[in-house]
């Protein structure tokens, strides 16, 4: 017998457990105290494990079964209803899922290509200050462009990365902060993460929680960049870094440029997410350090919960049930009778016992050995 399998019930279990995990992640992402106490990487790890649980719906044979017979029975009745003469509802839903996935993949692919095309055809201008900073420590496979058509600093790329800067009046230190932030996005491979998120959203386009989780993961990536930078900054530099965020936000709010799409790019600020900006300030100004032992324990518990989730499956409990056999007396020979109770042989009876009051209620069936 195989140790594991994939069934409709393992898919259902994965979907439900993913949604539960996603809701917990979203709720805790909005709690600054939780992030300060446990770190943003715990939420990112939880998000990764939640997605793995969703796309690997393994059904273990020794998993604990949670009986959903009462839910499954009417659901099954609904799914096997026919639409017309040949198409069942479940077939229609699978067809709709497939068409939707193809449509969303096409939409995200085309909009991402258009986004990158527009960025690569910007009207660029020189910026000596930024170019000097760039030449000091940037990797040669990173391309920098400055353009008045860019609304906020942003970055994208895999093998060769591109950083785009707006034509803002900023000091060398402010440009340095922005440059360092965008370089962090490159080092942490955030474009690749965003691309995977787009694929998963296209695959599970019918699940509204996916869109909310994607938005929160985007914000977590910004918080992670801030955390990486701030841990090496002095208090004075942290304050200047926050002042730079505010200055870029003010510049963006006074700009007449339309908000650009951000399917693959990661930007320095999000002018429409006030709560995120406030959270960035609270985290950078926080003076408490993470407890490494507690953080490691939280990681272990998270991984343990992920592994243990495979030992739970939601499905109708298929216990073997047998209908009880008949209770009767079988006449096998002139002086031999056999008593069967619930279909199971009990004992032999004599003719006197058979006709006694005790056994008179049982039917006598003529038979043979």
Descriptions of predicted regions:
Residues 312-369:
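Short linear regulatory motifs and low-complexity interaction segments
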Residues 2-67, 80-313:
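Membrane-embedded and juxtamembrane structural elements of multi-pass membrane proteins
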Residues 65-75:
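Extracytoplasmic catalytic-loop and juxtamembrane helix elements of membrane-embedded
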């Amino acid at each position: 017998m195989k140790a594991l399998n994939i069934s409709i019930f393992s898919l259902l279990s994965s979907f439900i457990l993913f949604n539960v995990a996603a809701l917990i992640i979203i709720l805790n992402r909005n709690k600054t105290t939780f992030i300060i106490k446990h770190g943003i990487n715990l939420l990112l790890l939880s998000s990764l494990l939640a997605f793995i649980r969703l796309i690997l719906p393994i059904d273990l044979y020794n998993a604990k079964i949670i009986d959903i017979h009462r839910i499954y029975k009417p659901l099954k009745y609904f799914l096997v209803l026919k639409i017309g003469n040949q198409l069942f509802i479940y077939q229609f839903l699978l067809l709709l899922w497939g068409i939707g996935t193809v449509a969303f993949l096409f939409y995200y692919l085309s909009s991402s290509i258009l986004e990158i095309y527009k960025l690569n055809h910007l009207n660029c201008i020189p910026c000596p200050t930024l170019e000097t900073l760039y030449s000091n420590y940037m990797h040669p496979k990173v391309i920098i462009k400055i353009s008045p058509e860019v609304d906020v600093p942003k970055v994208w790329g895999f093998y060769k990365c591109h950083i785009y800067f707006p034509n803002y009046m900023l000091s060398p230190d402010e440009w340095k902060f922005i440059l360092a932030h965008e370089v962090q996005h490159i080092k942490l491979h955030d474009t690749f993460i965003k691309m995977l998120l787009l694929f998963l959203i296209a695959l599970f386009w019918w699940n509204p929680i996916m869109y909310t989780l994607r938005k929160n993961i985007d914000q977590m990536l910004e918080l992670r960049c801030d955390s990486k930078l701030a841990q090496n900054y002095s208090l004075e530099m942290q304050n200047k870094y926050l002042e730079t965020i505010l200055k870029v936000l003010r510049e963006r709010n006074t700009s007449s440029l339309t908000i650009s799409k951000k399917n693959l790019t990661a930007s320095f600020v999000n002018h429409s997410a006030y709560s995120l900006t406030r959270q960035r300030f609270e985290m950078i100004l926080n003076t408490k350090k993470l407890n490494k032992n507690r953080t490691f324990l939280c990681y272990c518990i998270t991984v343990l919960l992920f592994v243990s989730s495979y030992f739970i499956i939601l499905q109708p409990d298929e216990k073997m049930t047998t209908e009880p056999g008949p209770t009767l007396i079988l006449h096998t020979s002139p002086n031999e009778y056999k008593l069967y109770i619930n279909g199971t042989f009990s004992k032999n009876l004599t003719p006197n016992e058979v006709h006694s009051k005790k056994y008179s209620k049982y039917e006598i069936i003529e038979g043979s050995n």
